[in-house]
Design a protein with these regions (language model features):
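An amphipathic, hydrophobic-aromatic interaction surface with interspersed Lys/Arg
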Residues: 40-111, 166
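Amphipathic alpha-helical protein-protein interaction segments
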Residues: 2-18, 91-101, 105-156
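Arg/Lys-rich, low-complexity, intrinsically disordered N-terminal tails that contact nucleic acids
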Residues: 1-65, 149-166
């Protein structure tokens, strides 16, 4: 049986109605501001080792592509502010590192030859840890259907006269 004193999520209140006119808890709203894309060369530097250099080049490209894919969407749906830059940057790094681990698993396999025989490829553990962190970022940023239901989109500053439904 459901606890009658438990708060309902704001979206559920909207869907089911609010007959008791209980206040709907809203979070702190920051004014939206443009996010500046980080210099991915700082995170994935050019190194002397050719294999690592290629890996870092690919990670830079993956992170850059993910940033450019999600920031415009998040700006509209979640109203990102400058304080959110680090969270989005970490999200993009997770995506790039998961790609790096998956490529390693595809080329070297799940089990590799070690000093003492066959052992699990370390990329399997690392990929799992990054996936757990990525799931947290997806929830924080509202990048999944269930997480989007918990977000309130930023209000547009439109005049009431400009309403297309009038």
């Amino acid at each position: 049986m459901a606890d009658p004193h438990r708060r309902r999520p704001p979206l559920q209140v909207v869907r089911e109605g609010n007959p008791g006119k209980a206040p709907v808890r809203e979070g702190v709203r920051l004014p939206p501001s443009p996010l500046v894309e980080p210099n991915w060369l700082d995170t994935f530097p050019t190194v002397a080792d050719l294999d690592q250099r290629e890996t870092n080049t690919r990670c830079r490209e993956i992170a850059r592509r993910e940033w450019r894919r999600v920031v415009p969407v998040l700006t509209l749906s979640a109203g990102l502010a400058a304080v959110d830059t680090q969270t989005v940057q970490d999200y993009c790094i997770c995506v790039a590192r998961i790609d790096q681990c998956e490529r390693d698993l595809s080329t070297r396999g799940m089990v590799i030859q070690g000093e003492r025989g066959w052992m699990k490829n370390g990329s399997t553990t690392i990929a799992g840890q990054y996936r757990q962190q990525l799931a947290r970022y997806i929830g924080e940023l509202g990048l999944s259907p269930s997480a989007r239901g918990r977000l309130t989109p930023p209000e547009d500053n439109q005049d009431e006269d400009d309403n297309v439904f009038d």
